[in-house]
């Protein structure tokens, strides 16, 4: 996920984890 956007290629659950 480093250097990549947290949306679009991730599911809602994955986004929440990445945002935490």
From Swiss-Prot:
SS bonds (residue pairs): none
Localisation: Mitochondrion inner membrane
A Gene Ontology cellular-component term: mitochondrial inner membrane
Record membrane topology: Single-pass membrane protein
A biological process from GO: oxidative phosphorylation
Segments of this protein annotated with the region Disordered: 1-20
Pathway: Energy metabolism; oxidative phosphorylation
Alphabetized UniProt keyword annotations: Membrane, Mitochondrion, Mitochondrion inner membrane
Domain of life: Eukaryota
Function comment: Component of the cytochrome c oxidase, the last enzyme in the mitochondrial electron transport chain which drives oxidative phosphorylation. The respiratory chain contains 3 multisubunit complexes succinate dehydrogenase (complex II, CII), ubiquinol-cytochrome c oxidoreductase (cytochrome b-c1 complex, complex III, CIII) and cytochrome c oxidase (complex IV, CIV), that cooperate to transfer electrons derived from NADH and succinate to molecular oxygen, creating an electrochemical gradient over the inner membrane that drives transmembrane transport and the ATP synthase.
Subunit and interaction comment: Component of the cytochrome c oxidase (complex IV, CIV), a multisubunit enzyme composed of 14 subunits. The complex is composed of a catalytic core of 3 subunits MT-CO1, MT-CO2 and MT-CO3, encoded in the mitochondrial DNA, and 11 supernumerary subunits COX4I, COX5A, COX5B, COX6A, COX6B, COX6C, COX7A, COX7B, COX7C, COX8 and NDUFA4, which are encoded in the nuclear genome.
Family: Belongs to the cytochrome c oxidase VIII family.
Protein name: Cytochrome c oxidase subunit 8B, mitochondrial
Organism from which the protein derives: Oncorhynchus mykiss (Rainbow trout)
Source species taxonomy: Eukaryota, Metazoa, Chordata, Craniata, Vertebrata
């Amino acid at each position: 996920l480093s250097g990549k956007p947290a949306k679009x290629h991730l599911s809602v659950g994955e986004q929440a984890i990445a945002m935490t």
